[in-house]
């Protein structure tokens, strides 16, 4: 079997001589290595460029967190494991920046201790057990010094502190606690060792919160020299962060974006090729981590300018059936009558306006860092799927002049739509599409599906990176192929 992304990462770091260690949460390291997940790596600052070039060669991409800001010397990288098609998160530290969950308002001078005295365990460099225990107790107690941090800790572990205490018991193995006094004296001399051991026992025995809170305040006072910001500044930062966090959650957004910027990715193809399924799956997959928006460009919402006309046209088409054109992407033969041609042309212009408005909104989101996933995408190719519809009439006359004016206006609107950054063009044999259509809740006529596969052009975008994907394969295989294409495009 092909080595996992994490295995290749560890092998690469070792072969290139990058000085690093997995500096925290090592109680769950085996699970993280097996499933990918998140790795917390402390990397020596002089090796930063070497490390980043190594992970870039493995397909990792730098990501920024807009909500929590950019902590100095702390970065996020994400990579796609080819075996599982799941994301691997590297939380990379060039300084020991830690502390509370939200602010991480402390920077401890422990890099040398963790890196120079690390040991190799199952292919991963880990810090000395006593050093990891010492820092764990300090980090845990700092979370008790703030009511907000305490509530976050309680929310994440409603049954108490089982996970916290389980990690503590893991770190207490091999008599690591006995060496903490020596390490404190050498590396954090401001911390009283008796207070440290009292804090350790308070966590271990699940002391009442009032006692833990008081001990945490005392410890925090002794760590004043290691703060990144003053108490007043930290309070303002916390208030701002909580407000922004509430706003982003209300909007249903994630805070991480690719450092290289956002991207508009379009799924295009005939009927029953799996566009909607893949858009939904992709938005759900990337939306667990990134700021993602999805939209259907074939059926755009009305703008304030087109709301009433769209409503009026809908009523007219239902109330007066003979006004409907007999050839309106249905695949049925025949030509619309004069009045139907006018109604059809008006509807086409309004649809072009709405599609352009939606495409421009999505483009603005992408250039501001968001990943945009589109179900279909319009083009200026007349007659192509979900694209311009109207041809300029050859015949002359007042009536044809009006239709020609509408056609030119519609074509111009489509030319103003910016192309997507990447296109995934889905294909399946027509007989498979017909079969899939029959399995839908809302079925189209079989003739319509055949017509869309054989007689209607798929829009093309010369300036966009276009990849063809055959979706006539097992669902999981199609999804994994789409994920690899999308990750390469970001």
Model-inferred region functions:
Residues 376-455:
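A glycine- and Lys/Arg-enriched "phosphate-lid" helix/loop adjacent to the NTP-binding pocket
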Residues 278:
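Hydrophobic positions on the alpha1 helix immediately C-terminal to the Walker A/P-loop
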Residues 269-270:
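P-loop (Walker A) phosphate-binding loop of NTP-binding proteins
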Residues 275:
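Conserved lysine of the Walker
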Residues 209-211, 215-237, 430-490:
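NTP-dependent small-molecule kinase module
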Residues 300-398:
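ATP-dependent small-molecule kinase phosphotransfer cores
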Residues 1-37, 43-263:
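Conserved NTP-donor binding/palm subdomain of two-metal-ion nucleotidyltransferases/polymerases, i.e.
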Residues 288-305:
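Short beta-strand-centered segment that lines the nucleotide-binding/catalytic pocket of NTP-utilizing
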């Amino acid at each position: 079997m092909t080595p996992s992304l994490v295995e290749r990462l560890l092998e690469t770091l070792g072969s290139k001589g990058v000085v690093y260690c997995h500096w925290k949460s090592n109680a769950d390291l085996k699970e993280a290595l097996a499933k990918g997940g998140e790795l917390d790596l402390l990397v020596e600052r002089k090796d930063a460029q070497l490390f980043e070039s190594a992970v870039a060669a493995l397909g990792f991409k730098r990501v920024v967190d807009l909500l929590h800001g950019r902590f100095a010397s702390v970065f996020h990288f994400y990579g796609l494991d080819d075996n599982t098609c799941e994301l691997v998160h590297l939380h990379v530290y060039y300084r020991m920046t830690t502390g509370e969950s939200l602010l991480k308002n402390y920077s401890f001078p422990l890099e040398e201790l963790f890196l120079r005295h690390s040991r190799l365990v199952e292919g991963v460099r880990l810090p000395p057990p006593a050093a990891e225990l010492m820092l764990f107790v300090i980090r845990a107690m700092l979370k008790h010094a703030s009511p907000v941090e305490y509530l976050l800790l309680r929310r994440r572990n409603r049954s108490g502190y089982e996970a916290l205490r389980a990690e503590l018991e893991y770190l207490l193995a091999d008599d690591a606690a006995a060496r903490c006094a020596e390490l404190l004296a050498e590396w954090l001399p401001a911390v009283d060792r008796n207070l440290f051991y009292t804090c350790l026992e308070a966590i271990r025995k699940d002391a009442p919160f009032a006692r833990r809170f008081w001990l945490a305040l005392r410890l925090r006072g002794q760590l004043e020299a290691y703060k990144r910001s003053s108490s007043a500044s930290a309070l303002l930062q916390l208030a701002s962060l909580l407000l922004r966090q509430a706003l982003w959650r209300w909007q249903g957004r994630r805070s991480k974006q690719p450092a290289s910027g956002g991207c508009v990715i379009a799924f295009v193809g005939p009927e029953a090729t799996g566009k909607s399924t893949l858009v939904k799956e992709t938005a759900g997959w990337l939306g667990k981590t990134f700021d993602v928006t999805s939209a259907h460009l074939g059926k755009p919402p009305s703008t304030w300018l087109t709301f009433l006309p769209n409503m009026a046209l809908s009523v007219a088409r239902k109330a007066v059936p003979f006004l409907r054109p007999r050839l309106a992407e249905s695949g049925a033969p025949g030509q619309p009558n004069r009045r139907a041609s006018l109604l059809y042309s008006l509807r086409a212009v309004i649809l072009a306006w709405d599609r352009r408005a939606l495409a421009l909104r999505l483009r603005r989101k992408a250039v501001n860092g968001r990943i945009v996933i589109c179900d279909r995408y319009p083009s200026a190719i007349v007659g192509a799927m979900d694209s311009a519809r109207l041809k300029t009439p050859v015949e002359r006359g007042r009536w044809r002049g009006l239709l020609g004016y509408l056609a030119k206006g519609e074509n111009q609107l489509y030319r103003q739509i910016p192309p997507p950054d990447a296109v995934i063009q889905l294909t399946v044999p027509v007989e498979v599409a017909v079969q899939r259509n029959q399995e839908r809740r809302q079925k189209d006529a079989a003739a319509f599906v055949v017509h869309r596969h054989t007689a209607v052009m798929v829009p093309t975008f010369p300036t966009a990176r276009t990849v063809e994907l055959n979706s006539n394969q097992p669902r999981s295989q199609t999804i994994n192929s789409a994920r690899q294409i999308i990750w390469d495009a970001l």
